[in-house]
Amino acid sequence: MQSYQLLIKVNKDIDLKVGKLGRFIFSIGSYVYTGSAKKNLDKRIERHLSKKKKLHWHIDYLLNNDAVQIIDIKKSEIIECILNKKTNGTIIIKGFGSSDCNLCCGSHLKYLGN
């Protein structure tokens, strides 16, 4: 399994419903999302880059907003949860992208600041 991180820029404060997690305010600034793909990492990343998709994962709801853009993508061989734990940032939404987390990360989305 390969993992990846998306460096995300939120260009204005947004109020957004994230699936069953609920409604949240995403403040302007930079975020990092850590994810993984069992089979085809490139297809997963390609899906994240598309604005036309069925909203399935928590990250889909954020990336689908016009005020949000992916700034950088980093691929890694490090296990998703270990990579996430090594990443600085503030957890703002508990459970975001971490429903299958094995290391109790709390969230796979971290706020890096403005």
PLM region spans:
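A short beta-strand micro-motif
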Residues: 4-9
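Aromatic/basic micro-patches that form nucleic-acid/chromatin recognition or nuclease catalytic surfaces
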Residues: 39-114
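Short, conserved loop/helix-junction motifs that constitute active-site signature segments
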Residues: 24
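GIY-YIG nuclease signature motif recognition
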Residues: 32-37
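Non-catalytic terminal regions with compositionally biased, polar/charged low complexity
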Residues: 27-28
